[in-house]
């Protein structure tokens, strides 16, 4: 993820001191990553996708109540893709494509490899340990591993996607260095991004649905169209000079997102009750087209509205917030093993899953950021994380 320490604003917005951090971007990352940790805690205790350690509730009421949170999680990482695209455009404007690509390989590729071959393995080991399976640590490495399942990117599919988009962007600008962002207005480019997400998602979902855990290395291909569209939208804003071309429409987009989300929820309820929920992801019928169109609209409208809200309402910084902002990327990379360790530590208390969820979430969020901050104090690590 690009560093907000870079000068990434339009000429008339350049801060007085070079290298000044964009505090609103730090705050946005802290909030989104904290939500990711809480969501992954919920999947272990309340339902949803699989986690390294699970102690699921048997209450259908809690599982049903968790569904809206799962629906929101579909759009949770959108702001990070948008901001990453914006940072990438401003960064590439100050360095050649080769240098930009090398920096992305260092800051995204290296953590991804460490996660796949170290962090994910340790999290799987801790999860099995929490289930009293008495695992042997060495069995979690090998070709293939004897324990812990195959190697996978897991929760770092976001980093894998961002690395792919960043390298593709560098290649594009090397072949065609002159940006064309000024030819489009903000509403036009947002409409184009929503349409791009809708079309590519419709094609991708024919093979891989949202949250499909059976993809290669759990890459979550069904999520990539949204990420690509929002990254491209951020790039456009960066090349145009300022995010204001998008965020100025924040209030209207908030209402647009709410309206589209209401229609999307109504469609989901209708399909669920009629037993045709799967039909909204396959084929070329009107249900599929309506589903992907609403998905594209919500992806863009919610992301830009949320980003505008953070920029307007939460742009300040204090000592604790600044440290959390600097540690946010490391916290995201490490949260799988930290969160699983906390879950295993509380497993012996034999509490109700619902209560354990609340306790673990409260403890794990600050611990993940603390682990990220501590890791960055190791010499050389801050250049990567």
Where are these regions (language model features)?
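Alpha-helical transmembrane segments and their immediate juxtamembrane cytosolic regions
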Residues: 2-385
């Amino acid at each position: 993820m690009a560093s907000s320490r870079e000068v990434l604003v339009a000429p008339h917005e350049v801060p007085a001191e070079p290298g000044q951090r964009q505090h609103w971007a730090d705050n946005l990352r802290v909030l989104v990553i904290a939500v990711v940790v809480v969501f992954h805690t919920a999947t272990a205790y309340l339902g949803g996708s699989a986690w390294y350690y699970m102690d699921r509730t048997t209450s259908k009421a809690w599982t049903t109540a968790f569904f809206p949170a799962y629906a929101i999680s579909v759009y949770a990482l959108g702001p990070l893709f948008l901001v990453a695209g914006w940072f990438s455009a401003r960064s590439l404007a100050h360095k050649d494509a080769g240098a930009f690509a090398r920096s992305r390989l260092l800051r995204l590729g290296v953590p991804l490899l460490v996660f796949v071959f170290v962090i994910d393995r340790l999290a799987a080991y801790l999860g099995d340990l929490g289930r009293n399976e008495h695992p042997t640590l060495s069995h979690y490495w090998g070709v293939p591993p004897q324990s812990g399942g195959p190697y996978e990117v897991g929760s770092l599919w976001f980093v894998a996607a961002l690395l792919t988009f960043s390298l593709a962007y560098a290649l594009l600008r090397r072949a065609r260095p002159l940006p064309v962002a000024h030819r489009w207005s903000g509403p036009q480019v947002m409409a184009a991004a929503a349409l791009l997400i809708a079309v590519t998602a419709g094609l991708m979902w024919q093979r891989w649905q949202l949250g499909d855990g059976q993809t290669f290395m759990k890459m979550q291909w069904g999520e990539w169209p949204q990420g690509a569209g929002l990254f491209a939208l951020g790039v456009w804003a960066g090349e145009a000079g300022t995010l204001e071309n998008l965020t100025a429409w924040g209030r209207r987009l908030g209402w647009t997102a709410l309206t589209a989300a209401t229609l999307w929820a109504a469609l989901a309820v209708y399909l669920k009750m009629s037993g045709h929920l799967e039909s909204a992801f396959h084929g070329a019928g009107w249900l599929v087209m309506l589903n992907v169109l609403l998905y594209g609209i919500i992806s863009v409208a919610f992301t830009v509205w949320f980003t505008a809200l953070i920029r307007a309402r939460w742009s300040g910084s204090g000592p604790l917030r600044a440290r959390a902002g600097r540690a946010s990327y490391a916290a995201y990379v490490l949260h799988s093993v930290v969160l699983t360790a906390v879950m295993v530590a509380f497993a012996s208390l034999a509490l109700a899953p619902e209560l354990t969820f609340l306790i673990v979430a409260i403890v794990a969020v600050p611990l993940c950021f603390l682990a990220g901050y501590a890791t960055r104090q190791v010499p050389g690590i801050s250049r990567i994380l």
